[in-house]
């Protein structure tokens, strides 16, 4: 097992800009959305028009099993333009707005989902984030008090470096913190005043198709969350993507998946050090694309885009994950876990220039004591919209 120990270069002050949250059903710990005792009623899916000729859109799926329209598309909310590469999106801290990014177009679409959650309203379009922020390739949207952090993959011209950009809740530019080189995802541990970011490739390489391996990042960066100062850098395997902290104020570790290294790493903060260790080496071509940690910190879910499956690991010993269940999902991609840890939604589109020829769908995996099972009643077709075929990527619960 390879390990890289990183010494923090500054004492981490306690996060004092806002109280440390107890937890969230969103990637951002600051989002106040569903509680564990609440069943989701809606699933939002950020969706690309497959041929790029029509506007991209937010798909609204009925997720209430008591509803007569359960597991069907009940609405769509179009953007003001097509060809965006609808990739990731995220809530504001109050879950009243969705910030949805065009990875290739640099557009930002802000949707109101507070007024009528079943019918999102496009409240604002920012036509060029590169012009307003100085950076391009909006990827992760991570809510913080007073706004949203956006992980920008590259500079204004599509090269290096990437950055973490803060926007206010109306999408106005606040500030930018340049990365050493690459950018992909953001994860914050407010109790430690620590932010971790990851790597992929720069926009001008991603838009051409599969980026050459020498143009793909392997760096993970630790930041002072309050000041935006880089504290440390680590080099793992190629394309360390999703930053997933363990849940709860006392947690000091997390997981990150290296897509092109076919590996999963665990990190832990202890005695002033941040250390990374490779804990899973998967088969060549597996391409771990997304990860979710159950809210009781018992299980890690990993989607394998290349292998076409979702795996569930027991992480009671985080440094030694144990496979407990696996289900086949062609081109398994983004996942969304419910706060009660019982349902795992999964999409199957990665990127327009990387996807294979598979039927596009959103599926539901039921998680129980015996492991995972695909729900035959929840199989949502993305092949037959009014505008034709569409590609589902990121998802949010409501």
Describe the residue ranges of each PLM region.
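Short loop/turn segments immediately following beta-strands, especially the blade-tip
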Residues: 60-69, 110-120, 169-170, 266-274, ...
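Asp-box/WD-like beta-propeller blade repeats and closely related beta-sheet repeat scaffolds
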Residues: 116-190
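Blade-loop segments of beta-propeller domains
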Residues: 70-142
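Beta-propeller domains
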Residues: 92, 180-183, 187-311
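Beta-rich, blade/repeat-based domains predominating
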Residues: 25-34, 38, 80-93, 130-144, ...
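Loop/turn-rich, solvent-exposed surfaces of beta-rich toroidal or solenoidal domains
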Residues: 284-362
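A short beta-strand motif characteristic of beta-propeller blades
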Residues: 73-79, 123-131, 172-178, 229-234, ...
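Short, conserved, GDST-rich strand-edge loop motifs in beta-rich repeat architectures
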Residues: 38, 45-52, 151-160, 198-216, ...
């Amino acid at each position: 097992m390879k390990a890289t120990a990183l010494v923090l270069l500054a004492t981490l002050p306690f996060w004092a800009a806002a109280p440390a949250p107890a937890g969230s059903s969103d990637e951002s710990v600051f989002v106040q959305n569903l509680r564990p005792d609440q069943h989701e009623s809606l699933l939002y899916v950020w969706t690309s028009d497959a041929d790029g000729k029509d506007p991209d859109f937010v798909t609204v799926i009925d997720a209430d099993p008591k509803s007569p329209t359960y597991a069907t598309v009940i609405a769509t909310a179009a953007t003001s333009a097509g060809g965006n590469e609808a990739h990731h999106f995220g809530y504001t801290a109050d879950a009243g707005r969705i910030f949805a990014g065009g990875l290739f177009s640099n557009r930002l679409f802000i949707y109101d989902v507070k007024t009528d959650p079943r019918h999102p309203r496009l409240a604002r379009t920012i036509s060029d984030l590169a012009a307003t922020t100085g950076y391009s390739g909006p990827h992760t949207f991570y809510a913080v008090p007073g706004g949203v952090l956006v992980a920008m993959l590259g500079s204004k011209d599509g090269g290096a470096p990437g950055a973490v950009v803060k926007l206010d809740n109306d999408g106005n530019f606040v500030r930018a913190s340049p990365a050493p080189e690459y950018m992909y995802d953001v994860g914050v541990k407010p109790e430690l005043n620590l932010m971790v970011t990851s790597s992929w490739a720069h926009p001008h390489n991603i838009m051409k198709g599969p980026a050459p391996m020498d143009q793909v990042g392997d760096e993970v960066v630790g930041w002072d969350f309050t000041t935006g100062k880089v504290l440390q850098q680590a080099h793992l395997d190629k394309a360390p993507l999703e930053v997933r902290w363990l849940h709860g104020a006392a947690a000091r570790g997390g997981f990150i998946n290296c897509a092109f290294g076919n590996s999963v790493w665990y990190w832990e903060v202890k005695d002033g050090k941040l250390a990374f260790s490779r804990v899973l080496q998967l088969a060549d071509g597996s391409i771990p694309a997304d990860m979710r940690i159950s809210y009781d910190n018992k299980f890690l879910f990993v989607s394998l885009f290349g292998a076409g499956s979702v795996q569930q690991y027991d992480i009671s010993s985080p440094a030694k994950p144990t496979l407990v269940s696996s289900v086949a999902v062609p081109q398994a991609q983004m996942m969304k876990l419910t706060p009660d840890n019982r349902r795992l939604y999964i999409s199957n589109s990665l990127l327009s220039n990387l996807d294979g020829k598979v039927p596009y769908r959103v599926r539901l995996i039921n998680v129980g004591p015996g492991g995972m099972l695909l729900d035959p009643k929840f199989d949502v077709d993305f092949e037959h919209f009014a505008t034709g075929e569409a590609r589902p990527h990121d998802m949010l619960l409501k």
